[in-house]
Amino acid sequence: AMTVAPFLRHGPEGAALPLVLDSPHSGEHYPDDFDHVPPRAMVRRAEDTHVARLYRGATRVGATLIEATFPRAYIDANRSLVDLDPSMLADDWPDAVTPSRKTEQGIGLVWRIARGGTPLYNRKLSAAEVQRRIDRWYLPYHAALATEIDTLHRAFGAVWHINCHSM
């Protein structure tokens, strides 16, 4: 199977500006282990579809765009790592969790429900599989974003970061 990178980096065309855009919710690659129960079309309603495409034009004026490739319902790059619902897990999570209102609504770090309230899973997730999602998708995305911001900050002394969404 083809290995999909956790993010796409769209670099500036021409001279760089200290401007980083990221699109954490436009990912359309559904990993093989995302065994959601509702139909794909329903799960896809969580996506900020086409947001990354809308902002790609910013690279023409010197911005850098980091785009998530994975779906937010699988692992949400715009949530804190502690924003986890322990009731979704079959076993204990090794770290402290601080579920937010988003998690209470079923849309935390790992989504419990699809848009409209349909449960995503007919099983509990293992702590190990959630950790794999974090390691394989979430952390590399955030590392790429941090690298971009740090590099431009060093070069320019300041940097602007715009987190891009469809609402």
Regions found by a protein language model. Give the residues of each.
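N-terminal catalytic or cofactor-binding beta/alpha core of small enzyme domains
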Residues: 2-161
